Regions:
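Conserved small/polar residues in nucleotide/adenosyl-binding loops
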Residues: 1-4
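Duplex nucleic acid-engaging cores and interfaces of nucleic-acid transaction enzymes
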Residues: 6, 11-152
Length: 152
């Protein structure tokens, strides 16, 4: 309709994607890394993917995120005791894929997935969590390159 085209052109409305087109779009996958201990680590690339990644994680898997700043959700795909080196590598990834990437001493919170909740009606990627511990990380690109990237 002409009126709709004019409204789109002026920015008052946006062209919508119908449900059939939406389903046809392939969902992107998170970054997949493998720690030096051989444990899989997944890193969300955007808010919607962070929701899926965190929502699909098992309750006893470890979840990490940069404290009080935008960043990727990181999941260590191992239940139970996590080797210290794997935890540090996951924290490096959480710091690198956050707004604190170029800062020193970036606080990275980690907790079990069971303590991460998404409030009803919250924006994509927004969660609240408890029982966390905090690591302070300063990272460089060379630190990230040392961690094996399995799939982009």
């Amino acid at each position: 309709c002409i009126r709709d085209r004019d409204l789109m052109r002026t920015g008052y409305i946006r062209k919508g994607v119908n449900r059939r087109q939406q389903k046809a779009l392939p969902k992107s996958k998170p970054y997949h890394y493998r720690s030096t201990d051989g444990i899989d680590i997944y890193v969300g690339k955007n808010a919607a993917q962070n929701d899926r990644l965190t929502g699909d994680a098992r309750p006893n898997e470890t979840w990490l995120h940069a404290k009080d700043m935008p960043g990727s959700h990181v999941i260590i795909r191992k239940e139970g005791e996590i080797p210290r080196q794997t935890l540090l590598e996951a924290a490096i990834l959480a710091a690198w894929y956050s707004k604190g990437q170029n800062s020193s001493g970036v606080p990275i919170d980690y907790t079990l997935r069971r303590y991460v909740k998404k409030p009803g009606g919250a924006a994509p990627g927004m969660v609240i969590y408890t029982n966390q511990r905090t690591l302070f990380m300063t990272v460089s690109e060379s630190d990230v390159r040392k961690i094996q990237l399995v799939e982009e």
